[in-house]
Amino acid sequence: MNRRRGKIDEKLFLDSEMKGISLIKGGNDYDYCVRLFLDDLELKNLAFHTRRWHRENLHHFKQMLLKLNLPTEPINIAEGNIKQCILHWKRESNLSPTTINHRIRSMKQMYNFLSNEGIVNQIPIAKVEKLKSPQVIIRPFEESEIHGLLRQPDKSSFIGYRDYTIMLVLLDTGVRLIELENMQLSNIDFNDNKILVMGKGAKEREVMFQGTTRLYLQRYLRLRGSLDHDYLWINIMGTKLNRNSVQDRLRFYGKQANLKGVRVSPHTFRHTCAKMYIMRGGDILSLQKLLGHSSLEMVRHYVDLWGSDLQQMHKKFSPVESLFRNG
């Protein structure tokens, strides 16, 4: 029987790694590499939906490689193989540039991880650029449209009252859908009218609400009652309300209100919150913090979008016009 040495020779590890043992085990198995990458994202505490998003993107890449009879082993995939996948999606599948770019982004992140771990020696996607995509402009709600939406929920029922309150929270705080979905009862501070939410990149931030939203939130909590979990938004069974249900309910109210030319979604509420905040004199620095943007780029984009509205606002509140009008 071969006995293990009493003392470990660390050179054994170094020699094995230099000879590429990890390349043989991992680099030849696409699914194994994806699993390692997703595990690393989990260790970095990235949200479940983010990990699922990457998994789906990487799955689509593998399926296309198989369809085109191209190598699927990460150590054998070449830059040309990746470009073939992209061209097929663009020409044959007619996918949007945004969807294709999402897949490119996931593949790049996985290869960067594999390279850092020594599982691959080259990053074939390193020089592959994202596709140019048209900027999608999300039209905010007009005030009349907001009133139309708020008239739809039946506030005499639990579902209607919950949905009405959700719309107020979306409009008042500008939170993302995932942030709304994961709101915790214990993170609401009614003394200072704020809610602690978990934003992108597992970054916490506080969002604010005011008197009307506070009133409906407190009443909703009485309807919600005491449960064995801390999630704020629930369905009639008392379990956590999922994001698909929120989106479906909002679309339903949009149809009931007969809204045309505007997407009725949580993200439209977010854009509407941003616009109304700016139009009522809010500054972009505080808006950036409230919305959880990592830079001012997106907030500046909001201002650019609503230039004509700002012109009307300046016409109404011009310092010089006001001075001479009152003088």
State where each predicted segment sits.
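Conserved catalytic core of the tyrosine transesterase superfamily
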Residues: 1-327
